[in-house]
């Protein structure tokens, strides 16, 4: 069983566990999938919160505020007596009265062409979540989860969340939604949790604690992007011994397959025998020259080659024969001495990729996720045409620091998958998840339209500066491209090794605008190379191109911990969390975080041209809903 935990945006099915399920099913291994994030939100917004009219409570009703906190909605699953809704404030009563309509409207297209109604719907749902009666230290939103007492970057706090799952807002869902799913069949031999965002961490560990109590013999496997980043930090260790049986860094397909093949009777280490067969915590033996990446984290060595295939979008790359580890698994090439790309990455014209023999690739399986589970005007199909990044030169990029190889799929594989998935899902939108869609992939899509609107992240290149090519992209279904401009100052871009020329960026924005493709532009302020004047040049660039920029994401730079030693900057601990991925630093130009925040609040977000872009950028769901806004 594979589970996607809360909290992340409940607008599209989880691609990670769908990819794993597709691979396992192709190898003859059955696998159940649960999107506990979207199911959890559906439970919180469920029948327990309904009422017929203002002042007339529903069957479960509402109750007024606990002392010291604003009025709250009664938690699903509780048995507190009904209270009159007139005790609630006007906003909450209105939000409750319109709850069904908001949920219905967010699943239909017309709302996305009405910005005021859309913002009201999102704000009202956020109000309801804010008023649910959990601990006052908890702030729950549609895309975020914060706890004033527990930090997602402190392992002891994650263990505390696991020790008291009843304190988590999703605990009623664990009891009434998740537990019955596990009870209908025999307990699974293993449960995999896919943890990708910090907003998921505390809820994921609360869920793990709940599952460990209910199913002590079941093996718990924890993987995903966030876990990979944790394990690939210098001197990484396993802080969850005794709670989590396996930590998986990097792609988990081979690990899970070997686990399924070698699990025997399904006995967890320290558990009780559940039937015949051998104890399955024994490591699969093979002479693979394993070297420790860190204490109790192991990585296999691979025979790597570089393959240049001009007939495909990319070359295949899939690991093979991965052993099962007792504690942690990593496919980290840096630790094992694996051959790979040079540190400076491939050049702009590079078309090849690292490749492994014995290519195995499977189509993701989204059949377990009904479209009505998600807050979107139609099913969204998430799809990865490649793992890693074809550029791999940007300073402070984790793809380079973690030595993630570029692992693309061939053209025929991409189009075969998309053809199959569009027939199965009838999607309203395809979301390409690639870190950066390669020029070859974009060209292939321009030549072979997939018949469904699509969007994704792309680098600013000469290819996108060509008006004719952009028109072909639009004709192929491209609705929006996300562009990491980062800065409007050429010196800053060069210092970051972005490979972006501002003159080219200008032509790209105008070409996309002329073709009818929305540009979702990402800006990053406070980098070590930036000062106030450089930041002002960014503001000037954005203002000058404001009519060509559809949406904006404005972020404050954080220095990754992996870059601290080589940055040449004076650094200090960003937080006391042992799992923190960032450090604080003394800005070499005196451009402190406090000054940057003031600049963003005063000169950036209040600039009339930029403020207009921010107003049309969807709140909370941001780039996930922006394509629907762009389609009008």
Say what each PLM segment does.
Residues 236-258, 476-479, 537-559:
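Structural recognition of alpha->loop->beta junctions
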Residues 197, 226-228, 401, 436-438, ...:
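Active-site-proximal loop/turn and secondary-structure-junction residues that shape catalytic pockets
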Residues 7-51, 60-81, 114, 121, ...:
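Glycine-rich beta-alpha loop elements in corrinoid/cobalamin-binding modules
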Residues 2-3, 7, 11, 19-21, ...:
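C-terminal accessory regions of radical SAM enzymes
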Residues 24, 389, 483:
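Conserved, mostly hydrophobic/aromatic
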Residues 1-4, 217-221, 415-519, 525:
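Conserved SAM/AdoMet-binding glycine-rich loop
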Residues 375-412:
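Canonical Radical SAM [4Fe-4S] cluster-binding loop centered on the CxxxCxxC motif
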Residues 27-29, 185, 424-425, 508-519, ...:
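A structural motif corresponding to the C-terminal end of an alpha-helix
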């Amino acid at each position: 069983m594979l589970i996607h935990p809360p909290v992340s945006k409940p607008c599209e099915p989880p691609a990670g566990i769908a990819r794993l399920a597709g691979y396992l099913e192709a190898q003859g291994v059955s696998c159940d999938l649960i999107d506990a994030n979207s199911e959890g939100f559906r439970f919180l917004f469920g029948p327990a919160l309904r009422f017929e009219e203002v002042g007339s409570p529903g069957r479960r009703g509402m109750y007024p505020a606990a002392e010291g906190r604003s009025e709250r909605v009664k938690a699903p699953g509780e048995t507190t007596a009904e209270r009159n809704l007139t005790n609630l404030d006007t906003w909450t009563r209105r939000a409750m009265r319109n709850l069904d309509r908001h949920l219905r409207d967010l699943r239909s297209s017309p709302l996305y062409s009405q910005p005021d109604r859309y913002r009201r719907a999102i704000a009202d749902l956020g109000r309801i979540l804010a008023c649910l009666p959990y601990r006052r230290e908890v702030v729950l939103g549609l895309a975020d989860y914060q706890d004033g007492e527990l930090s997602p970057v402190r392992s002891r706090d994650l263990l505390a969340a696991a020790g008291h799952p009843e304190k988590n807002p999703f605990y009623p869902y664990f009891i009434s939604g998740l537990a019955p799913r596990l009870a209908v069949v025999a307990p699974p031999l293993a449960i995999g949790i896919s943890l990708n965002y910090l907003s998921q961490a505390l809820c994921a560990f609360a869920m793990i604690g709940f599952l460990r109590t209910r199913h002590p013999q079941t093996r718990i496997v924890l993987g995903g992007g966030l876990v990979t980043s944790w394990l690939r930090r210098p001197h990484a260790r396993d802080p969850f011994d005794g709670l989590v049986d396996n930590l998986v860094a990097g792609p988990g397909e081979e690990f899970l397959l070997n686990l399924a093949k070698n699990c025997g009777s399904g006995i967890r280490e320290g558990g009780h025998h559940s039937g015949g067969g051998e104890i399955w915590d024994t490591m699969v033996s093979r002479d693979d020259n394993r070297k420790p990446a860190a204490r109790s984290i192991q990585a296999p060595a691979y025979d790597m080659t570089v393959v240049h295939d001009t007939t495909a979008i990319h070359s295949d790359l899939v690991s093979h024969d991965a052993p099962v580890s007792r504690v942690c698994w990593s496919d980290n090439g840096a630790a094992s001495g694996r051959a790979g790309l040079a540190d400076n990455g491939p050049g702009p014209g590079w078309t090849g990729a690292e490749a492994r023999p014995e290519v195995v690739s499977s189509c993701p399986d989204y059949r377990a996720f009904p479209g009505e589970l998600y807050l979107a005007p139609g099913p969204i199909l998430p799809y990865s045409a490649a793992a890693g990044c074809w550029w791999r030169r940007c300073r402070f990029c984790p793809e380079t620091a973690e030595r993630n190889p570029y692992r693309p799929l061939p053209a025929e594989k991409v189009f075969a998958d998309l053809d199959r998935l569009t027939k199965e899902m009838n999607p309203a939108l395809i979301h390409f998840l690639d870190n950066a869609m390669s020029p070859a992939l974009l060209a292939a899509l321009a030549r072979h339209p997939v018949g469904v609107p699509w969007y994704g992240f792309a680098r600013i290149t000469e290819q996108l500066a060509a008006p004719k090519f952009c028109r072909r992209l639009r004709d192929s279904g491209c609705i929006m491209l996300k562009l990491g401009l980062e800065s409007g100052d050429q010196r800053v871009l060069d210092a970051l090794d972005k490979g972006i020329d501002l003159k080219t960026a200008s032509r790209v924005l105008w070409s996309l605008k002329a073709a009818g493709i929305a540009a979702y532009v990402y800006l990053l302020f406070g980098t070590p190379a930036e000062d106030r004047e450089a930041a002002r040049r960014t503001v000037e660039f954005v203002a000058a191109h404001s009519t060509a920029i559809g949406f904006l994401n404005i972020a404050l730079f954080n220095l990754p911990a992996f870059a601290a030693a080589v940055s040449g900057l004076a650094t200090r601990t960003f937080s006391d969390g042992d799992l923190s991925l960032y450090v604080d630093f003394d800005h070499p130009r005196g451009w402190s975080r406090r000054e940057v925040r003031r600049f963003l609040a005063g000169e950036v977000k209040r600039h009339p041209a930029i403020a207009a872009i921010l107003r049309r950028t969807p709140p909370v769901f941001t780039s996930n809903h922006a394509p629907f806004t762009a389609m009008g």
